[in-house]
Amino acid sequence: MVNWELLKNPINWLIVILMLTIAGMAATLVCNHFGKNAVTSE
């Protein structure tokens, strides 16, 4: 079940948004890292 009291707290929304943003940035960095390595692999 969803705890609606947690969703009413704006700080929790900020935490969720930050987590999603960090996860997206990390995924992008990983993709770029392996993409460059694949192209310039020796």
Swiss-Prot record:
Subcellular location: Virion membrane
Positions in coiled-coil regions: none
One GO cellular component term: membrane
Protein keywords: Capsid inner membrane protein, Membrane, Transmembrane, Transmembrane helix, Viral genome packaging, Viral release from host cell, Virion
Membrane association type: Single-pass membrane protein
Transmembrane segments: 11-31
Function: Together with P22, forms the internal part of the portal complex embeded in the virion internal membrane and which plays critical roles in genome packaging and genome ejection. Both proteins multimerize as a single ring-shaped heterdodecamer arranged around a central channel and interact with the P6/P9 external part of the portal.
Subunit: Heterodimer of P20 and P22; further multimerizes as hexamers of heterodimers. Part of the dodecameric portal complex that is composed of the packaging efficiency factor P6, the DNA packaging ATPase P9, and the internal heterododecamer P20/P22 which spans the virion inner membrane.
Protein name: Packaging protein P20
UniProt source species: Enterobacteria phage PRD1
Gene label: XX
